């Protein structure tokens, strides 16, 4: 093989995600999860995404009364619809194409279906994309979360579980900061009312999710390389999608409201080692690894707790509670309204400046917004 021609896909062994992250299956309290979900009305936002769709598949097994799935991506939603029709014929499933930012559409949904449990997985998640589009991080991630959270309270949802990220900890990019602001809002709203319990789950990268390194590396290996890694020292915490989703459900049963649950992600993984392992497992030869440099807003390593946070154990060995600073609801709401107004100007610098005011620990890395840090 001359290294120039495309490798035949048939010559390469299909790399299984589980081979890349060998570990014991995480056990969860199935009885508690069943009690929470069986016979209930469950809403999942971002239901077409990697996490949302897996939560949907897991929830469907517990026979909820009604499963309401919302996402703006029509084709993946159609895929989920077909999956449910095939695998859960008796299950009442609603697939709604819509945006969490469309307040009127979401209000109609809540009025008609009054979900008892909400799993909020909808978000823009790609760091470089949000560095270039901070207005959309504000309007989709922050405002969209507020729309769904407020409607949950208005229509008497019992529990709202938000999916957050380790990028919200000491954020270095717009995406991470937007998720930290969502966490702050959920905690403040939890303390502000007694109807709905707001719980946040925070975890790192999930292996094999849409647009993550695994599918990208697979494609690069298939083409004969090079495999592009941003930096030789970059490390990330990884989980398998099903184990992350199982822990989301477990945290949902545990949360009494106001908690930020942090998942034990195991040992961090060097991305370059992951690339080498994938090349070896695929059986490919002479594949070069090249380093492209850190992307805008990218950290060398992620943290699951911020500098001033500490964590408390829970009954589950893989789940801890982060003790974080909380803010009064009126201040949080005022900040969000101001930030949304600024986002309508699509002035990137002004938007990020306000985000840094709200989250003072947000310090930009490899980014045009570094000029805003003092």
Question: What are the residue ranges of the model-derived segments?
Answer:
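Conserved Rossmann-fold cofactor-binding substructure of NAD(P)-dependent oxidoreductases
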Residues: 96-117, 297
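Conserved glycine-rich Rossmann-like NAD(P)H-binding loop of the short-chain dehydrogenase/reductase
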Residues: 64-79
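Strand-loop microenvironment adjacent to phosphate/nucleotide-handling motifs in alpha/beta enzyme folds
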Residues: 27, 32-34, 188-374
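N-terminal Rossmann NAD(P)H-binding glycine-rich loop of SDR-like oxidoreductase domains
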Residues: 42-62
């Amino acid at each position: 093989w001359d290294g120039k021609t495309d490798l035949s896909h048939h010559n390469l062994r299909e790399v299984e995600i589980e081979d890349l992250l060998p570990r014991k299956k995480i056990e969860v309290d199935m009885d508690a999860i069943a009690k929470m979900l069986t016979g209930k009305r469950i809403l999942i936002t971002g239901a077409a995404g990697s996490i949302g769709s897996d939560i949907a598949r897991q929830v469907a097994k517990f026979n909820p009364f009604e499963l309401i799935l919302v996402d703006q991506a029509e084709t993946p939603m159609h895929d989920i619809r077909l999956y449910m029709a095939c695998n859960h014929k008796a299950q009442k499933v609603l697939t709604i194409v819509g945006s969490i930012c469309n307040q009127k559409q979401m209000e109609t949904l809540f009025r008609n279906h009054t979900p008892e449990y909400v799993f909020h997985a909808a978000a823009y998640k790609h760091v470089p994309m949000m560095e270039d589009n901070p207005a959309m991080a504000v309007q989709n991630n922050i405002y969209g979360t507020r729309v769904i959270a407020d409607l949950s309270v208005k229509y008497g949802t019992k529990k709202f579980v938000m999916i957050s990220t380790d990028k919200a900890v000491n954020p270095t990019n717009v995406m991470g900061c937007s998720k930290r602001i969502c966490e702050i809002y959920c905690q403040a709203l939890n303390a502000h009312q007694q109807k709905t319990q707001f719980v946040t789950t925070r975890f790192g990268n999930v292996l094999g999710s849409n647009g993550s390194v695994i599918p990208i590396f697979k494609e690069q290996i298939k083409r004969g390389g090079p495999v592009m890694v941003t930096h030789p020292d970059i490390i990330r915490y990884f989980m398998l999608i099903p184990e992350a989703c199982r822990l989301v459900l477990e945290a949902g049963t545990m949360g009494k409201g106001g908690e930020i649950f942090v998942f034990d992600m195991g040992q961090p993984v060097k991305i370059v080692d992951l690339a080498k392992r994938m090349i070896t497992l695929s059986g490919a030869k002479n594949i070069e690894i090249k380093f492209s440099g850190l992307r805008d807003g990218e950290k060398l390593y992620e943290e699951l707790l911020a500098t001033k946070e500490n964590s408390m154990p829970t009954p589950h060995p893989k789940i801890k509670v982060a003790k974080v600073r909380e803010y009064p609801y009126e201040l949080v709401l005022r900040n969000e309204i101001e930030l949304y107004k600024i986002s309508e100007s699509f002035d990137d610098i002004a938007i990020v400046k306000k985000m840094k005011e709200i989250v003072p620990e947000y310090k930009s890395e490899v980014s045009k917004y570094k000029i805003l840090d003092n």
